[in-house]
Amino acid sequence: QTEGEFGSNGAVEVAQRLAAENGLYMPFQYGNPANPRAHYEGTAEEIVRDCPEVDVFVAGLGTGGTLMGSSRRLKEHRADIRVIACEPLQGDPVSGLRSLDDGFVPPILDLARLDRKLLVGNRDAILMTRRLAAEEGIFAGVSSGAVIHTCARVAARMTRGTVVGIVCDGGWKYLSSGLWTDDVDAVEDRVDNGIFW
């Protein structure tokens, strides 16, 4: 068991220790080369096929797999595509994403592959998650709200071009949080301190 104060970093450390002590296999998505390979062969290949004009690619900084695999394939498609990581502000957790300032850098993450990191706060992620549902009918989770908020920031600074962002978590995980119905301050506190599924 881990103390809640150690968050997902503590859980990863305990899982690695238990696997090592007991001779168990741990898929370890943060360090497994199959993770970025799946995005190289799948996610990015779909983007190249369906949106070859992409100029900017935005994904949340979680395990690093989406960013690493997609960036490699997209830069092969066109070297000038910008790859941007959406990262939560330190001390302002966004469910599903991780701040590198919290001390854990996924082994598969190569920061040199990123053109930029943009920070996003939990409140902005929640507000965009609500907008996605209300305005676009997209029932996404908070990390997806963070990514689309980042996409909007990037697009606002562009005079032309195409931004692609990854909506990777579902709203069903947050049904008990009151994300779409309760006061934003109350939801922000619940999302900061909870696991919903």
List the predicted regions and their residue ranges.
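Residues at the starts of beta-strands that form the adenosine-phosphate
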Residues: 80-82, 162
